[in-house]
């Protein structure tokens, strides 16, 4: 060995083998060093991965699982589920099924699970809660034969729909929540049909949510583009001062910003008082601008406007002013130069802003809840209702899953039409 490397002969030819001071091949030493660097890099970002997993990936996975899980009936009505596996759904089950149901209801009442069972069945077929709880109290005093006593007590036990509901909810994994989320259900024969017209609300809510989110996005583009253009065109000192006004809403509570619109837009509010004072309308013609869809769109536009301005501004700052001057020097009208040269260069910012605003808008909850009234409610409000009041978490998770699917599809369409590589936030 001479110094840090040695010479060796292989196949009759002399080759130079580089080694470290301690005699290890240099290639192996470099590989070990690179491996150590990669391990240290992974350890540095490991807390971030853990945070993303527990705060983002795990909750989404849990929500999706909650939307299809259905263990309650299978766990607490074991005998009934076993009998109904072979039921042909053409006629009311035999005495054996009624006896199994009586045993399961008595056992569920002793374990205090009958209320949960009744609530779950009532979600699927309204009215079954009272049937289950009432029958559970009576069944403990009944003896064979059970079939006549069940039907005599509540006629629902003689209907195929009641037993079909029990059979539909027997599997531990089910899609009934997703069917309910699109106003569908399984009938007695197991076919997918529309639910009663009086209960069809979710498809309309999804359509309203999409339409209002599109309106908010368009309003943000129309208002945000001139603001971003002005900020990008002004000298740095002045644009920084005006940027504070754009960022000011982020420093104000969302609740304060939303309730301020109630003060401004209500029938006895500032805007109506001003129009009456100017003479645009008289006192009897005051306009209802809040607690409806219009109020929701106005309030959400103001709240989400910064999310449109900031991506536009960051892209516009990178467009050289010489582009417009060059187009005008070649004979183009100022507006034509702006439209044909400047605007196409801002499309990455427009796409980023639209994507961001639309995704935020379809999932907004507090603003529609405060200013939406009945006409301005969105699908997020119905998700909150099922989470907090009706406690139908499976349906709430299914509605959230469909909303997530819509966002993923929107992202996919944007990638196909525009290209996600052109998405610029700054």
Each model region followed by its residue ranges:
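Loop-to-helix entry region at the N-terminal start of transmembrane alpha-helices
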Residues: 43-44, 201-212, 276-307, 354
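Transmembrane alpha-helix signature in integral membrane proteins
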Residues: 199-230, 343
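Interhelical loop and adjacent transmembrane-helix boundary motif
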Residues: 37, 76-79, 83, 369, ...
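Membrane-topology segments of multi-pass transport proteins
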Residues: 1-43, 62, 66-203
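Membrane-interfacial helix termini and adjacent extracytoplasmic/periplasmic loops
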Residues: 27-34, 257-301, 371-374
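Transmembrane alpha-helices
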Residues: 47-50, 302, 307-313, 320, ...
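Transmembrane-helix boundary motif in ABC transporter permease subunits
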Residues: 27-29, 33, 62, 215-247, ...
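C-terminal transmembrane helix and the adjacent membrane-cytosol boundary/short C-terminal tail
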Residues: 313-324, 328, 397-426
């Amino acid at each position: 060995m001479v110094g840090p490397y040695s010479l060796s002969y292989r196949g009759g030819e002399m080759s130079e083998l580089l080694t470290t001071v301690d005699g290890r091949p240099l290639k192996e030493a470099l590989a070990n060093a690179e491996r150590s660097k990669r391990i240290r890099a992974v350890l540095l970002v490991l807390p971030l991965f853990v945070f993303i997993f527990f705060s983002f990936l795990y909750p989404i996975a849990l929500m999706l699982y909650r939307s299809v899980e259905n263990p309650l009936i299978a766990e607490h009505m074991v005998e009934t589920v076993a009998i109904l596996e072979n039921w042909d759904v053409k006629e009311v089950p035999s005495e054996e099924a009624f006896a199994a149901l009586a045993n399961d209801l008595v056992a569920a009442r002793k374990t205090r699970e009958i209320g949960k069972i009744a609530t779950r069945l009532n979600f699927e077929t309204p009215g079954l809660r009272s049937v289950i709880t009432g029958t559970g109290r009576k069944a403990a005093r009944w003896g064979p034969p059970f079939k006549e006593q069940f039907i005599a007590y509540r006629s629902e036990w003689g209907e195929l729909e009641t037993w079909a509901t029990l059979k539909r909810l027997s599997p531990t994994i089910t899609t009934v929540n997703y069917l309910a989320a699109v106003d569908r259900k399984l009938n007695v024969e197991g076919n997918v049909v529309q639910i009663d017209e009086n209960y069809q609300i979710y498809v309309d809510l999804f359509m309203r949510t999409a339409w209002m989110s599109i309106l908010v996005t368009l309003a943000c583009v129309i208002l945000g583009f001139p603001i971003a253009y002005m900020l990008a065109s002004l000298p740095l000192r002045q644009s920084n001062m005006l940027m504070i006004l754009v960022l000011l809403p982020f420093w104000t509570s969302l609740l304060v910003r939303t309730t301020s619109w109630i003060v401004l837009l209500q029938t006895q509010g500032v805007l109506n008082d001003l129009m009456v004072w100017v003479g645009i309308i008289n006192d009897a013609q005051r306009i209802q601008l809040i607690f409806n869809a219009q109020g929701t769109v106005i309030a959400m536009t103001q709240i989400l406007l910064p999310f449109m301005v900031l991506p536009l501004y960051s892209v516009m700052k990178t467009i050289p002013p010489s582009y417009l001057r060059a187009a005008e020097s070649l004979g183009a009208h100022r507006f034509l130069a702006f439209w044909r040269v400047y605007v196409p260069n801002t499309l990455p910012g427009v796409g980023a802003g639209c994507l961001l605003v639309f995704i935020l808008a379809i999932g907004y909850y507090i603003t529609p809840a405060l200013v939406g009234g009945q006409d301005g409610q969105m699908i997020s409000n119905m998700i909150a209702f099922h989470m907090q009041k009706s406690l139908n978490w499976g349906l709430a998770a299914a509605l959230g899953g469909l909303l997530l699917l819509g966002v993923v599809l929107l992202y996919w369409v944007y990638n196909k039409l525009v290209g996600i590589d052109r998405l610029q936030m700054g």
